[in-house]
């Protein structure tokens, strides 16, 4: 290392090994600018603290990665480490504008030129920057001493418990009050008025016990009410589950009549059955008229598909295809 040479460091992305010659080309380029590469480390070694950098040692630090400019990823926590390892006015290359805020926060000055030589420079005096502690101008309550919380002299308001004897009484409405209210609205039904009169006529004590037998009328036990099959919401009357009026028998009779009509199958005579017969000459044939010629001439819905060719009027023999059956 000569007097005019400057010390440099290369931080290598692990994927650089996939691009042969990239590292050597970068070393040659930096050597032409009078930089001597004293160290080179993998970025993951620096990230997991396997390697530590000395403070104010390097004039240049270069982050070498094969990633595209818009896809570069870098651990942000290493930016202050790099700033500490650079000398004053030292340069850091390899990152983009995406990390601009982190660079400014950590005391870098951004240099952007037209020949894609984008880099950061460690500003003078950034290493001696001190944190300024802010103090509040106003004091709340007593002064805060020795980290204790402030105290307040004002007391919280107190409330007295309400006496049990001052409970509100229930307001009862008389029939006259209800009638006055109903007169104001002529559209109210008379049913509401009759209900009000009924409940007002009851003079039962709330604490008195009521015998349930007194609520049963003398006519309630005269007899059992028979449930008869009546009309339902459906259009047609249907029998109940335990029908005793004969409705269930009528429904069963109707179902039997329907089944009897369904059992009557339409009977065809022999002439009607042979009205369309492809095996009898002179009878009507299908639309294609080629049913007897074989599968090559038959329609897709022909009933003779798969059978051998035959002459009209000749009985069909399956002996020719017995080997296939």
Swiss-Prot record:
Function statement: Component of the cytosolic iron-sulfur (Fe-S) protein assembly (CIA) machinery required for the maturation of extramitochondrial Fe-S proteins. Part of an electron transfer chain functioning in an early step of cytosolic Fe-S biogenesis, facilitating the de novo assembly of a [4Fe-4S] cluster on the scaffold complex CFD1-NBP35. Electrons are transferred to DRE2 from NADPH via the FAD- and FMN-containing protein TAH18.
Organism ancestry: Eukaryota, Fungi, Dikarya, Ascomycota, Saccharomycotina
Keyword Transmembrane: no
Cofactor: [2Fe-2S] cluster; [4Fe-4S] cluster
Keywords: 2Fe-2S, 4Fe-4S, Cytoplasm, Iron, Iron-sulfur, Metal-binding, Mitochondrion
Entry-linked InterPro entries: Anamorsin (IPR007785), CIAPIN1 (IPR046408), Dre2_N (IPR031838)
Designated gene of the protein: DRE2
Subcellular location(s) per record: Cytoplasm; Mitochondrion intermembrane space
Gene Ontology molecular function, alphabetical: 2 iron, 2 sulfur cluster binding; 4 iron, 4 sulfur cluster binding; electron transfer activity; metal ion binding
Protein family: Belongs to the anamorsin family.
Name of the protein in its database record: Fe-S cluster assembly protein DRE2
Residue span of region N-terminal SAM-like domain: 1-169
Organism: Vanderwaltozyma polyspora (strain ATCC 22028 / DSM 70294 / BCRC 21397 / CBS 2163 / NBRC 10782 / NRRL Y-8283 / UCD 57-17)
Motif Cx2C motif 1 per UniProt: ranges: 288-291
Positions with a binding annotation for [2Fe-2S] cluster: 229, 240, 243, 245
């Amino acid at each position: 290392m000569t007097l005019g040479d400057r010390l440099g460091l290369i931080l290598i992305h692990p994927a650089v090994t996939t691009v042969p010659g990239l590292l050597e080309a970068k070393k040659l380029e930096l050597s032409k600018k009078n930089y001597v590469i004293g160290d080179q480390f993998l970025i993951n070694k620096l990230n997991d603290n396997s390697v530590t950098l000395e403070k104010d040692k390097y004039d240049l630090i270069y982050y070498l990665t094969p990633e595209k400019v818009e896809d570069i990823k870098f651990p942000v926590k290493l930016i202050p480490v790099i700033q500490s390892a650079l000398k004053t006015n030292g340069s850091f290359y390899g990152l983009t504008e995406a990390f601009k805020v982190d660079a400014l926060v950590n005391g870098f000055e951004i240099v952007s030129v037209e020949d894609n030589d984008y880099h950061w420079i460690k500003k003078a005096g950034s290493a001696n920057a001190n944190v300024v502690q802010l103090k509040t101008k106003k004091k709340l309550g007593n002064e805060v001493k020795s980290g204790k919380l402030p105290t307040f002299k004002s007391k919280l308001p107190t409330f007295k418990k309400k006496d049990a004897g001052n409970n509100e009484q229930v307001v009862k409405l008389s029939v006259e009050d209800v009638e006055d209210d109903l007169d104001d609205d002529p559209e109210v039904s008379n049913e509401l008025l009759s209900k009000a009169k009924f409940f007002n006529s009851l003079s039962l004590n709330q604490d008195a016990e009521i015998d349930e037998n007194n609520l049963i009328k003398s006519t309630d036990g005269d007899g059992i009410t028979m449930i008869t099959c009546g009309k339902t919401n459906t259009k047609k009357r249907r029998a109940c589950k335990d029908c005793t009026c004969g409705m269930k028998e009528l429904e069963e009779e109707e179902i039997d009549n329907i089944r009897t009509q369904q059992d009557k199958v339409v009977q065809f005579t022999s002439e009607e059955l042979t009205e369309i017969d492809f095996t009898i000459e002179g009878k009507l044939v299908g639309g294609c008229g080629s049913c007897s010629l074989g599968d090559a001439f038959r329609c897709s819905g022909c009933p003779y598909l798969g059978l051998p060719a035959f002459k009209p009027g000749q009985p069909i023999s399956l002996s020719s295809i017995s080997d296939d059956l």
